[in-house]
Amino acid sequence: MLVPIPALNDNYIWLYGRENLPVIAIDVAECKNLSAYLTQHHLQLEAVLLTHYHDDHTGGVEELKRYYPDIPVYGPAETADKGATHIVNEGNIQTAHYRIEVVPSGGHTANHVSYLIDNHLFCGDTLFSAGCGRVFTGDYGQMFESITRLKQLPDKTVICPAHEYTLSNLVFAEAFAPNEKVKSAVKNQRISVESLRAQNKPSLPTTLALEKNINPFLQAENLADFIYLRKAKDNF
């Protein structure tokens, strides 16, 4: 089971679980929608994963813990005061039913992490469909290194970003496409996403294979090109 639960303006709280097992929640932006979904579908919550400290990824944790006082909450050091009970930065987490790989992915924030469960990557604000996160408390070199690390995952990896930014990202990617082949691929994806969003359907998840064809930040060959694109997107 893989479910993006809409939250706030454009966030997704991701739920992941195998059949008939408790589920994992990633980046609890708010409690209300998450707890309602869990109750409606009679789901048990096994753990919470936080990618970074920003309030739109952690704002629901404390309220959620009122309903699940013993729930383990994993996150990087920067989430220690946001409800995290277990601090992680790399390596593996073993819950009752899941083995979770912690992937360092700083840049958006200095200690940002992503989580790989089976072949699903929950990457917070590091990698978006057709885009990547802004650089705040991290730096450009760190972000480029993180994007490059994620790019090495298998093409079949399912990418689960925390925001519905796809359409605006595709508009940028089309404008900055390096050649007609890429521009055509981006345009086709934009048309597809426009249809989904018109029906109020999520554009996510995506796959690494698709992102390699449409995401300008995955196509950046060096740090200088990456910085150029990131600054251009900041002002687009």
Curated annotation (Swiss-Prot):
<feature type="binding site">
    <location>
        <position position="54"/>
    </location>
    <ligand>
        <name>Zn(2+) 1</name>
    </ligand>
</feature>
<comment type="similarity">
    <text>Belongs to the metallo-beta-lactamase superfamily. Glyoxalase II family.</text>
</comment>
<feature type="binding site">
    <location>
        <position position="52"/>
    </location>
    <ligand>
        <name>Zn(2+) 1</name>
    </ligand>
</feature>
<feature type="binding site">
    <location>
        <position position="108"/>
    </location>
    <ligand>
        <name>Zn(2+) 1</name>
    </ligand>
</feature>
<comment type="function">
    <text>Thiolesterase that catalyzes the hydrolysis of S-D-lactoyl-glutathione to form glutathione and D-lactic acid.</text>
</comment>
<dbReference type="Pfam" id="PF16123">
    <property type="entry name" value="HAGH_C"/>
</dbReference>
<feature type="binding site">
    <location>
        <position position="163"/>
    </location>
    <ligand>
        <name>Zn(2+) 2</name>
    </ligand>
</feature>
<comment type="subunit">
    <text>Monomer.</text>
</comment>
<dbReference type="InterPro" id="IPR050110">
    <property type="entry name" value="Glyoxalase_II_hydrolase"/>
</dbReference>
<protein>
    <recommendedName>
        <fullName>Hydroxyacylglutathione hydrolase</fullName>
        <ecNumber>3.1.2.6</ecNumber>
    </recommendedName>
</protein>
<keyword id="KW-0479">Metal-binding</keyword>
<feature type="binding site">
    <location>
        <position position="57"/>
    </location>
    <ligand>
        <name>Zn(2+) 2</name>
    </ligand>
</feature>
<feature type="binding site">
    <location>
        <position position="125"/>
    </location>
    <ligand>
        <name>Zn(2+) 2</name>
    </ligand>
</feature>
<dbReference type="InterPro" id="IPR036866">
    <property type="entry name" value="RibonucZ/Hydroxyglut_hydro"/>
</dbReference>
<keyword id="KW-0862">Zinc</keyword>
<dbReference type="GO" id="GO:0004416">
    <property type="term" value="F:hydroxyacylglutathione hydrolase activity"/>
</dbReference>
<dbReference type="InterPro" id="IPR035680">
    <property type="entry name" value="Clx_II_MBL"/>
</dbReference>
<dbReference type="Pfam" id="PF00753">
    <property type="entry name" value="Lactamase_B"/>
</dbReference>
<feature type="binding site">
    <location>
        <position position="56"/>
    </location>
    <ligand>
        <name>Zn(2+) 2</name>
    </ligand>
</feature>
<keyword id="KW-0378">Hydrolase</keyword>
<comment type="pathway">
    <text>Secondary metabolite metabolism; methylglyoxal degradation; (R)-lactate from methylglyoxal: step 2/2.</text>
</comment>
<dbReference type="GO" id="GO:0046872">
    <property type="term" value="F:metal ion binding"/>
</dbReference>
<dbReference type="InterPro" id="IPR032282">
    <property type="entry name" value="HAGH_C"/>
</dbReference>
<dbReference type="InterPro" id="IPR017782">
    <property type="entry name" value="Hydroxyacylglutathione_Hdrlase"/>
</dbReference>
<dbReference type="GO" id="GO:0019243">
    <property type="term" value="P:methylglyoxal catabolic process to D-lactate via S-lactoyl-glutathione"/>
</dbReference>
<feature type="binding site">
    <location>
        <position position="125"/>
    </location>
    <ligand>
        <name>Zn(2+) 1</name>
    </ligand>
</feature>
<dbReference type="InterPro" id="IPR001279">
    <property type="entry name" value="Metallo-B-lactamas"/>
</dbReference>
